[in-house]
Every structure is written in structure tokens, then in C-alpha cells.
């Protein structure tokens, strides 16, 4: 089996073929997801809430992400793995390099950082040192206390223009992927069309190049799930078919539908 690479993901964008991504935290589920054709997985700091039972992602440590990245890599040798850099793990350039190296050694293909234009120097430094970077804009869960909760971002002209500016700036800094969370569909389309790199949406409509969901959300485990979530297990009947259905509906553009999107 051929490993998934950024070259492949860039080609998918060029061909306007959508791809599905899912969070993974252990070897067993990672193997199951790979069997269903999921080629990109995110070891997300969402594990703080889904696995550890915290109210936010803030308590998650680098060591937590390292541990779960190793577990996921053990379950799927060919998958493209993105590992979250958790809260305050990239506050300084030195810290960023040290922690990114830990995640790459654990089996990640790329690290993900939350934040806008202020990350330019950090991203530039990491990419110059051969660390592929994914940025995360829109609703950034590590900033939940500053944002005042989990709210849709970019609804007014000023904030929308800032997100567009941030996306362009971060692409110039060297990011190779962008996650765009909880923004209106029209803004997601503007950013996706503007950038040369693939954009992965979550709560951003079906106009992005790819989609990502927390695995617990796809399987209907989450209590009071967000609007953009669909319970694929309810329709499919078993976990394997649920993941396959998620992948198929993302690739065909069926999911997310209007009922899962913000306008």
C-alpha cells in the first residue's frame, strides 16, 4: 500500500476531488479507519474532552499527543498523520522546535498550530527545519476563553477579512494545509479558492477541499453535538460502515449538507 503524502493531497485539490479526515487516538481505531479508506488522520487535542473528560482542550500536554500519535502510527503505517500542538506548546520559537520534533519522532507527518498571522515567524522557522505545518483558523478551541465560547467566527466583514488575510499570510509563511472551523460557507469558499494549498473544513460547509470530524461525533457518542455533526452510525448500523459512509458522503459532497452549515 502506498503512503499518503502532501503531493497526493495537492493533486486532489487540483483535481477538485474531496477527501475525508477523522480524529484518531489509538491503534485499533486507526487501523479500522485505514481499512475503510481514510488516508488522513488527526491526533487532535480534542482527546482532552473525548478521552480525558475535560471541558476544554487546554489541559492536554505535548506528552499526551506524543503518546497517542505513537498509538495511531502503530495501527496504520501508511496514513498521513497530523498531530496537534497543544495549548502553550508553541509560545516561543525554541519551544515550537522542541515540541514539533517530539511529535514528528512519534510518527506524525505534520504538526497543527492554532492561530493567525502572529504565527508567521514560528511557521516559517518550522518549515525551514523540515517540519510540515498545518494551520487552524476560525474557531480555535485553545482560545475558547478569549473567544467567549464555541461560536461561529467570521460573520461580520471585519472578522471575515481578517481571516482571509491570516490565511494568505500563513500560506506565505509555509503552511501546507489549513483547517477552517465554524465559519460561514461563503467565507470558507473564498478562502478555499484563494489558497493554493488544501483546506480542510469542520463546520465550514461542503465547499472546502476536505472535511474532518471528531471520531466520537461521527459515531453519535458526543452528548449535545454541534450543528455540523452527523451521526453516521445511526444510518449505517455498524462502525465500519459508518466510517465508510462518512468517507463516501464527503467525497461526493453530500456531507456536510445545508443543515450542517452556517450562513
Swiss-Prot record:
Instruction: List required co-factors.
Output: Mg(2+)
Instruction: State its location(s).
Output: Cytoplasm
Q: Name one GO molecular function term.
A: magnesium ion binding
| Catalysed reactions, as listed in the record | 3-methyl-2-oxobutanoate + (6R)-5,10-methylene-5,6,7,8-tetrahydrofolate + H2O = 2-dehydropantoate + (6S)-5,6,7,8-tetrahydrofolate
Q: Where is 3-methyl-2-oxobutanoate bound in this sequence?
A: 45-46, 84, 112
- Residues binding Mg(2+): 45, 84, 114
Keywords (A to Z) from UniProt: Cytoplasm, Magnesium, Metal-binding, Pantothenate biosynthesis, Transferase
Summarize subunit and interaction data from the UniProt record for this chain: Homodecamer; pentamer of dimers.
Family membership, please give it: Belongs to the PanB family.
Q: What is this protein called?
A: 3-methyl-2-oxobutanoate hydroxymethyltransferase
Q: Source taxonomy lineage? A: Bacteria, Pseudomonadati, Pseudomonadota, Gammaproteobacteria, Enterobacterales
This protein's gene is called panB
